[in-house]
Every structure is written in C-alpha cells, then in structure tokens.
C-alpha cells in the first residue's frame, strides 16, 4: 500500500501537471477477472508535495476474518497510519493505539522505478464522455500507458471540473484484475505538515516481530493499572 501512493502521484502528474495537494476519504478495491471483490481498503488520504498519509481502520476491511479484527481491536492495533516520505526515502507504519511505529527505507530500486515512470512512460488519453460522480461533474478519460519492455496498461479516469481536474475515480484494468480508487469529501488545500511526522513521544520498534509483544505488554500494563 505504501508504494501505491507515490506511483499514483507520478501517474496523475503526467496527466495533470497541476495536480493539487488535497485530503479525502479514499477507497481502494481490487476485483478479479470475474468481477469478484478480492480486497477493499478504506482510508483517509492526504497528499502534500511528494509525501503521503493514509489512515486505515483495519476493522473496516471485510477480507480480514471477524475474529482477527476483534483481536486487533482488543490490542489497539486496529488503527494503522502509513506515512510515505519520498523526500526522506522512508515509510513509517504508525500504530496510534499503542503509540509505536516501524520505519522502513524506500529502496533505490523503487525510487529508480519512480524516475523511469516519470520520464519513460508514454500516456495517451482520450475523452470518452462525461459523468457525475458523488455530485461532481467529471470528464471521463480513457488512458493508455506504454513503457519500454512492459505490457501496455489501460485505465479510466473521472476528472472533476470543480476540483482542479483531480481524478476522483480511477479504474486500472489488467489481464486478470481491476483496481478501483475513489476519493470522496475532497478538500483542496495543503494538509498540515504535522500529519506527515511521527509524534515525538512514539516508540520506534526494531522490526515487525516486535509489534504483537509490545501491544500485548501495553494491554497487560493498562489492565494492571486499572482501578480494582
């Protein structure tokens, strides 16, 4: 998920050079070749420059079994924030319920791929109609993306006239799957810089194996401190 946002910015910037900074409620869905929903990921999304914030409620993901969702909620691991800082070449996974986070580097391979996408990808766009999406009058555009040594990809964008042509709905169509991204309650404004920083009092964990023991210990300490 963390790597989707920078690619989204590169793709949109090639189509809309003046892509605005904004915040919105986002929905990402993946369907298989038969049209069956395989993954749903609702999130609060914010874009500031080349940096991104995605707030995810894990209990709102239907693909996660109910008993697992309950366990995550009990341990306060149900709220996850992804902060992608391209300028620092870092991704932060922040668990606000336990005041802890993980930090990962953005690989040079990934950053090189972003650079290639921004320079070598050829996009052809064709207006195929108009449509109103969530109350916004949109131009519907078919996009064909070609890149050396890679198969051609196609997608459809709905660009909102009253939101500086921001695509508020995107469908990327592949051979055996379809990705759909939608933005609602869009606010065209520069998000606060503090949203892209990890709170100073949060504990940095060494690796992902530390999350569950740390959350369990926090829960045990909270239970011990509770009035009897």
Task: Give names to the regions the model predicted.
Residues 1-53, 198-228:
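N-terminal leader/targeting segments and the immediate start of mature chains
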Residues 27-33, 57, 94-96, 144-146, ...:
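A generic structural motif
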Residues 40-46, 79-83, 126-131, 154-159, ...:
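Hydrophobic/aromatic beta-strand elements that line small-molecule binding cavities or substrate pockets
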Residues 43-115, 174-182:
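An acidic-aromatic
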Residues 114-132, 187-197:
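Short acidic, Pro/Gly- and aromatic-enriched capping/linker segments at domain boundaries
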């Amino acid at each position: 998920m963390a790597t989707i946002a920078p690619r989204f910015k590169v793709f949109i910037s090639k189509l809309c050079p003046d892509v605005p900074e904004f915040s919105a409620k986002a929905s990402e869905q993946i369907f298989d070749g038969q049209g069956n929903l395989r993954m749903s990921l609702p999130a609060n999304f914010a874009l500031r420059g080349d940096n991104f914030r995605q707030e995810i409620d894990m209990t709102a993901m239907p693909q996660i079994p109910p008993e697992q969702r309950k366990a995550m909620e009990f341990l306060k691991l149900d709220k996850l924030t992804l902060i992608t800082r391209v300028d620092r070449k870092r991704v932060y996974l922040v668990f606000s319920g336990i005041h802890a986070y993980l930090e990962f580097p953005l690989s040079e391979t990934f950053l090189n791929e972003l650079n290639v996408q921004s320079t070598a990808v050829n996009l052809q766009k064709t207006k195929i109609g108009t449509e109103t999406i969530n109350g916004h009058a949109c131009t519907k555009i078919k996009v064909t993306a070609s890149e050396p040594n890679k198969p051609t990809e196609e997608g459809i964008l709905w660009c909102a006239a009253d939101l500086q042509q921001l695509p508020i709905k995107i469908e990327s169509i592949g051979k055996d799957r379809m990705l759909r991204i939608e933005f609602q309650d869009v606010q065209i404004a520069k998000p606060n810089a503090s949203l892209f920083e990890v709170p100073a009092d949060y504990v940095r964990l060494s690796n992902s194996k530390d999350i569950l023991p740390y959350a369990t210990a926090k829960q045990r300490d909270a239970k011990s401190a509770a009035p009897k």
